[in-house]
């Protein structure tokens, strides 16, 4: 029998889970918060006019669910705890514009196990991607019909990875449910004084024994990587890999469910002087996997 904790104790325990002991799992909702621009904020009833007002209130704890009644472009602060998001009407997608976050992602997750609901939500215009991890042993499952639109990483210091999602570390796992959509996300890197590289316009995974699983009807369109190491003075190499998905490391596994669609994804590189481009490499317009014993499985 699954033990049931009192609400107060349960919320206290969830709030303390930023320090992992064995694993972190946030699949259960602790409380619901509503974002509704048509209403005045009423914190006592968990109602907020904007998403930024809710995040700034520090009322959210790990496992809470944010219910969106409308599009929102208010965020200037990234999330410090992993919470769920869903549209109040599953038939009406709600778009969250992340441009106000600047060079910060929405989620920056540490080691642990996460299950996040993102149902009928569009994440758009993030300038540092949407989700980033940099630890070993991170497991992230995203449920619901989620879209990633026009997100990017723009790095003028040699390299850029994962326009929407970037996971760096061994034994990292990413799973997305049915109908996940990635459109017009990109990774761009430039340098006039050294080599540059960009990898994974939509998704980048770096590390050994990493796994990406996309369930049925995944769509990748118009995602790209672009590297530019053009210089007035000399030739510097420029590389660009995986317009949609990039995986680097031994024993990497990519599994795509039925009816996955890739269209208009590409890679592009420029290098050398403005009159020559002899050391530019672009590979994997849709998918690029690099490492020993890599495995790609395609559905019907």
What are these regions (language model features)?
Residues 1-9:
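N-terminal secretory signal peptides that target proteins for export/translocation
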Residues 12-24:
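Bacterial N-terminal signal peptides
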Residues 26-30:
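Sec/Tat signal peptide C-region and signal peptidase I cleavage site
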Residues 33-67:
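Acidic Gly/Asp/Thr-rich repetitive segments characteristic of extracellular carbohydrate-active
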Residues 52, 63-84, 90-103:
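N-terminal extracellular ligand-recognition/capping segment immediately after the signal peptide
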Residues 66-68, 83-89, 106-108, 116-118, ...:
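Well-ordered beta-strand segments characteristic of repetitive beta-sheet solenoids
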Residues 71, 83, 88, 101, ...:
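Solvent-exposed loop/turn tips at the surfaces of repeat/solenoid architectures
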Residues 98-109, 124-135, 147-169, 184-206, ...:
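Extracellular beta-strand/beta-solenoid scaffold signature
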């Amino acid at each position: 029998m699954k033990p049931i904790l009192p609400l107060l104790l349960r919320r206290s325990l969830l709030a303390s889970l930023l320090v992992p002991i064995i694993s972190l799992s946030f699949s259960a909702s602790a409380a619901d918060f509503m974002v509704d621009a048509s209403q005045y904020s009423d914190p006592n009833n968990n109602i907020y006019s904007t998403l930024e007002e809710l995040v700034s209130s520090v009322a959210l704890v790990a496992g809470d669910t944010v219910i969106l009644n409308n599009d929102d472009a208010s965020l200037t602060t990234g999330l410090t705890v992993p919470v769920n998001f869903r549209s109040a009407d599953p038939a009406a997608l709600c778009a969250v514009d992340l441009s106000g976050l600047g060079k910060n992602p929405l989620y920056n997750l540490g080691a642990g196990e996460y299950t996040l609901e993102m149902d009928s939500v569009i994440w758009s215009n993030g300038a540092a991607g949407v989700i980033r991890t940099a630890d070993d042993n991170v497991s992230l499952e995203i449920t619901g019909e989620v879209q990633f639109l026009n997100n990017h990483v723009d790095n003028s210091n040699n390299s850029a990875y994962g326009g929407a999602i970037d996971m760096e570390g061994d034994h990292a796992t990413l799973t997305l449910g049915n109908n996940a959509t990635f459109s017009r996300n990109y990774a761009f890197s430039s340098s006039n004084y050294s080599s540059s590289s960009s990898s994974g316009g939509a998704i980048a995974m770096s590390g050994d024994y990493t796994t990406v699983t996309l369930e049925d009807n995944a769509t990748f369109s118009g995602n790209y990587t672009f590297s530019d190491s053009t210089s007035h003075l000399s030739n510097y190499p420029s590389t660009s890999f995986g317009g949609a998905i990039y995986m680097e490391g031994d024993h990497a596994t990519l599994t795509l469910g039925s009816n996955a669609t890739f269209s208009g994804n590409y890679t592009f590189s420029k290098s050398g002087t403005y009159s020559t481009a002899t050391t530019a490499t672009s590979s994997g317009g849709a998918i690029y996997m690099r490492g020993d014993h890599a495995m790609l499985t395609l559905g019907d």
